[in-house]
Amino acid sequence: MSVKPIDNYITNSVRLFEVNPSQTLFSISYKPPTQKTDTKVSFRTHNSHLSLNYKFTTNKSKDVSRLLSALGPRGVSITPGKIEKIAQSKKKNNKIKESSKKIKGKSIQDIVGLATLIVNTDVEKSDPAAKKTATEPKQKANAVQNNNGNSAASKKKKNKNKGKKKR
């Protein structure tokens, strides 16, 4: 299993931002298509103080989505490549020999989102289910009002549109 270029770009950009956040610039540029296959989105991380520049260009929406989520507060998960897995397994073997206990290691590495580094606080996960429960009583109350005397106008609209076809 080899490391993908997008994973290299994400890890290098996050490390660069962790080292020197005030001098690091992120730029996203979009090249509109002259033909359908010529669409390009390029992501660039640049630090002139350390003279580092990372660039990733793609035309796939999946890659763009992954990079934008890496910029967000939750970050992304990256599977390590062959070299990193070998290094991790050597470390595990040394630990097992020393402690004579089996240690289960994760093969997936979580990368912190760049927005978390900018804010410098932990980001809490929000539950979308909590938002749905708050809106349900309002919808039920509106339905009760419509079933009572306020529904005369809505019945006229329904009867008026009864014979028409929907498009």
From Swiss-Prot:
Q: Is this entry keyworded tRNA-binding?
A: no
N-acetylserine (modified residue): where? S2
Q: Where in the cell is it found?
A: Cytoplasm; Nucleus
- Give the GO biological process terms: SRP-dependent cotranslational protein targeting to membrane; SRP-dependent cotranslational protein targeting to membrane, signal sequence recognition
Primary localization class, coarse? cytoplasm
Where would one find the signal peptide in this protein?
Answer: none
Q: Which domain of life is it from?
A: Eukaryota
Q: Which GO terms describe its cellular component?
A: nucleus; signal recognition particle, endoplasmic reticulum targeting
Give the Basic and acidic residues compositional bias ranges.
123-139
Q: Where is the composition biased (Basic residues)?
A: 154-167
GO MF terms listed in the record are: RNA binding
Q: What else is known?
A: Present with 3400 molecules/cell in log phase SD medium.
Q: Tell me, in a sentence or two, what this protein's role is.
A: Signal-recognition-particle (SRP) assembly has a crucial role in targeting secretory proteins to the rough endoplasmic reticulum (ER) membrane. SRP is required for the cotranslational protein translocation for ER import and preferentially recognizes strongly hydrophobic signal sequences. It is involved in targeting the nascent chain-ribosome (RNC) complex to the ER and is proposed to participate in the arrest of nascent chain elongation during membrane targeting.
| Quaternary context | Fungal signal recognition particle (SRP) complex consists of a 7S RNA molecule (scR1) and at least six protein subunits: SRP72, SRP68, SRP54, SEC65, SRP21 and SRP14. At least SRP14, SRP21, SRP68 and SRP72 are proposed to get assembled together with scR1 RNA as a pre-SRP complex in the nucleolus which is exported to the cytoplasm.
State what protein this is by name: Signal recognition particle subunit SRP21
Which organism encodes this protein? Saccharomyces cerevisiae (strain ATCC 204508 / S288c)
